């Protein structure tokens, strides 16, 4: 449904600009749609990490003369680094599996593992479909295992 909305938006944009900017069937259209679709995952993860930072750290930083940008780089970023990494991993795994928007919005001759799997399965070539499907599983599994390892080491270090 979101892919259809993106197609309509880009069609309106193309008509409004007199077809100067054609984004509907380009990689930019796919990137825009994936950004809109998966924005909630990293946003929620980063906000969750940011909300755990006590506000008195920012007050102490200002009283010590640090600017807002300096505080962001020296205090905020190191404290929410794990939240950013976890959000990036979860977003990456979801993007690798995404088929509907990629199938609708992709440019001609632009294939992903999900579109290869879909095409082979649609043609009932299950053996050929198993290879890209297996890679989707492996590509999705490795970051999740790394994230699980990080979480286990984090929770065991607290005990």
Question: Which residues are covered by each model-predicted region?
Answer:
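Membrane-embedded alpha-helices of multi-pass transport/permease systems
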Residues: 29, 36-58, 96, 100
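Residues that define the loop-to-transmembrane-helix transition and helix capping
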Residues: 27-28, 58, 69, 81, ...
């Amino acid at each position: 449904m979101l892919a259809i909305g993106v197609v309509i938006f880009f069609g309106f944009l193309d008509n409004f600009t007199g077809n100067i900017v054609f984004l509907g069937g380009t990689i930019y259209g796919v990137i825009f749609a994936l950004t809109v679709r998966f924005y909630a995952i990293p946003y929620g993860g980063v906000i969750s990490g940011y909300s755990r930072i006590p506000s008195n750290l920012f007050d102490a930083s200002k009283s010590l003369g640090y600017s807002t940008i300096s505080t962001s780089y020296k205090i905020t970023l190191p404290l929410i680094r794990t939240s950013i990494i976890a959000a990036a991993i979860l977003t990456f795994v979801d993007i690798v599996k995404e088929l509907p928007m990629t199938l609708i919005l992709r440019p001609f001759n632009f294939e992903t593992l999900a579109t290869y799997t879909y095409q082979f399965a649609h043609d009932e070539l299950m053996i050929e479909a198993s290879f890209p499907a297996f890679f989707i599983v492996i590509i999705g599994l490795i970051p999740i295992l790394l994230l699980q390892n990080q979480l286990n080491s984090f929770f065991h270090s607290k005990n």
